[in-house]
Amino acid sequence: MSTLHSTPRADGFYMPAEWATQTQAWMIWPERPDNWRLGGKPAQAAHAAVAKAIARFEPVTVAVSAAQYENARARLDVPNIRVVEMSSDDAWVRDTGPTFVINASGEVRGVHWGFNAWGGFEGGLYSPWNRDEQVASKVLEIERCQEYRTEGFVLEGGSIHVDGEGTLITTEECLLNHNRNPHLSREEIEAVLREHLAVEQIVWLPDGLYNDETDGHVDNFCCYVRPGEVLLAWTDDPQDPNYPRCQAALQVLENTRDAKGRTFKVHKMPIPGPLYATEEECAGVDAVEGSQERNPSVRLAGSYVNFLIVNGGIIAPSFDDPMDAQAKAILQQLFPEHEVVMVPGRELLLGGGNIHCLTQQQPAPQRI
């Protein structure tokens, strides 16, 4: 399909909210042995569980390497899951896949952001990442969607959340990090977001969750529930390093209006743990120069906020933690018309993210 030389805003396209009706969800099969322990086998089982949970509500497409195609097809042998061969460097389709945009006449296109493995050679998590840079184009080609490119502008899908009504939430820790777009000012970054997502108001939270190796992605910390309402990861423990981060985010949200002039209603989601990898879990990850080291003394950035909204369902991680039941109850209260499905998320967390990070929703065409 063709690459367009205009912008979504100029063409009447915008990024819809995650709760908009979806055609399908995309995933990528995990196998990288220097990120996923034991050659990715435990993560593959967890990944399959997520895909099957989503497939109860809508179709899923899982991209997989040629080497793993037969294995993935066998593990994902349910009617609503399609498996396609696609090369990539890892499984984080939220960050490497396209951001889909729609217009009022029923067309869907995609934005292909620049990608540098969360920091390039200044804190990035692996190298090379050239196959990941091609994922967005490949997805759009398969779906016959036209593509917008942001040459020279790096952004991961997990670093933004939108309400579909003109407001975007992000973090300074990530988007203003020197290892993403050091040549651009805050105002210039905002201009790119406005042109490619058709948003008006950009809400900057200072930081994301403590020790999030993506440099504080907002999708692990704060997300929309509906327009004007957000769910914020939260701790009341002043000794928790997340405490000042939560307080600072709440301060911003309580003193900011969205694009429609609304003040935010903030719901709080307890943070699980603290969670740590075991020595055995870390020992199962291949040690490769240039890749993220796994260390049992480093706290994991576990979060129940890292869930996916699908058609009629909420797919959220559980951690075998005392907070699991409370997290499910909070989500069910906030989404009364959705079925909340908790899927074990520890193996995904050990790899550096969770359900939202490993999925990318494709909105359905909408005619207005």
From Swiss-Prot:
The record's listing under InterPro entries reads:
Agmatine_deiminase, Peptidyl-Arg-deiminase_porph
Give the residues annotated as active site. C357 (amidino-cysteine intermediate)
Q: What's the short name of a Pfam family annotated to this entry?
A: PAD_porph
What reaction gets catalysed by this protein? agmatine + H2O = N-carbamoylputrescine + NH4(+)
Q: Using the chain's own numbering, where are the disulfide bonds?
A: none
* HAMAP family cross-referenced by the UniProt entry: Agmatine_deimin
Q: What is this protein called?
A: Agmatine deiminase
